[in-house]
Swiss-Prot record:
Substrate binds at residues 62, 101-106. It catalyses: D-arabino-hex-3-ulose 6-phosphate = beta-D-fructose 6-phosphate. This is 3-hexulose-6-phosphate isomerase. Residues 44-186 form the SIS domain. Keywords: Carbohydrate metabolism, Isomerase. Pathway: One-carbon metabolism; formaldehyde assimilation via RuMP pathway; D-fructose 6-phosphate from D-ribulose 5-phosphate and formaldehyde: step 2/2. It comes from Mycobacterium gastri. The active site is at residue 166. SUPFAM superfamilies: SIS domain. Its EC number is 5.3.1.27. InterPro entries: PHI/rmpB, SIS_dom, SIS_dom_sf.
Length: 199
């Protein structure tokens, strides 16, 4: 225990802990994002704006990040669906499935990719593992060189589980949206008209 632990065993977080860990997260995200191949991301971005609908699928925290990406792509004017939602239609030929799995082996995500492939849809994937089943199914792959969630004690990250992958996934999807938007003359006010008004 450090000074953050009191004599009775209760943990007392102090300001220095937060400062140090903000720096830790910031530096790990910056270092890892800098190692992502921008050409891989550009190929994925071009897949997104091809004709067809966009579907997103991911488990756990990766899935939550892709939900955020789906929201931005909806703001951009694309037709976007989240796999598993009750109103999500069947994927079909010409559509794109955007998936994320740190390991590239998450069973539900791989199964979704296999189903989409059989339907004639395109697959774009984010993963840490270029040799994974998910990467093998994908038409476009972005490798995020972060630790996998089961890689405890990794030299890549001091953070728990798949945190670094999920953080960089968020940053990369935000960069994709920003890059797509940069190539239009659409004002923020127009994007805002698509924002949910039933909140």
């Amino acid at each position: 225990m450090t000074q953050a632990a009191e004599a009775d065993g209760a943990v007392k977080v102090v300001g220095d802990d937060i400062t140090n860990n903000l720096s830790l997260v910031r530096d790990e995200v910056a270092d890892t994002a800098a190692k992502v191949d921008p050409e891989q991301v550009a190929v994925l971005a071009r897949q997104i704006v091809q004709p067809g609908r966009v579907f997103v699928a991911g488990a756990g925290r990766s899935g939550l990040v892709l939900r955020m990406a789906a929201m931005r792509l909806m703001h951009f004017g694309l037709t976007v669906h989240v796999a598993g939602d009750t109103t999500t239609p069947a994927i079909s030929a010409g559509d794109l499935l955007l998936v994320a799995s740190g390991s590239g082996t998450t069973s539900g995500v791989v199964k979704s990719a296999e189903t989409a492939k059989k339907a004639g849809a395109r697959i774009a994937a984010f993963t840490t593992n270029p040799d994974s089943p998910l990467a093998g199914l994908a038409d476009a792959v972005v490798i995020i060189p972060a630790a996998q969630k089961t890689d405890h004690g990794s030299h890549i990250s001091r953070q728990y589980a798949g945190s670094l992958f999920e953080q960089v996934l968020f940053v990369v999807t935000e960069a994709v949206f920003q890059s797509l938007w940069d190539h239009t003359e659409v004002e923020a006010e127009e994007l805002w008209t698509r924002h949910a008004n039933l909140e």
